[in-house]
C-alpha cells in the first residue's frame, strides 16, 4: 500500500535500535516478498494474517499501524496510519518514558 511504502524508511531506521516485528495482513506471499525485495526487510520476524482476523482482534483499523509493546505485553503506543522518522522518535521517547526509561 502507498502508506506502507511511505513509512518504510522510518521502520528501517527504527530496526537499527529496537527489534521490529511485522504482520503481513491479507497480502499474497509473492506480493509481500516483492515489497521486502524493493524496500528491504527490517523485521526480525513476520507473522501472517491472511484473513485479517488476528489484526482485527488486536484493534487494527487501517494499514499501516505501528504498535510499541512493553516487555509485559502492554501496548504503550498505537499509531494509526503511516509513521515518519520525525514522529517516530518522539513517539518512542514518550513510550519509553511511560515505562520509566529515560532517553
Summary of predicted features, one role per range:
Residues 37-42, 49-96:
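Thiol/disulfide oxidoreductase modules built on the thioredoxin-like
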Residues 100-103:
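Non-globular targeting/processing and membrane-anchoring segments
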Residues 2, 12, 76:
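Nucleotide phosphate-binding site architecture
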Residues 18, 44-45:
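Short, conserved active-site loop motifs that form the nucleotide-linked donor/cofactor pocket
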Residues 1-5, 66:
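The canonical Cys-X-X-Cys-His
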Residues 5-39, 50-56:
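Structural microenvironment flanking redox-active thiols in thiol-disulfide oxidoreductases
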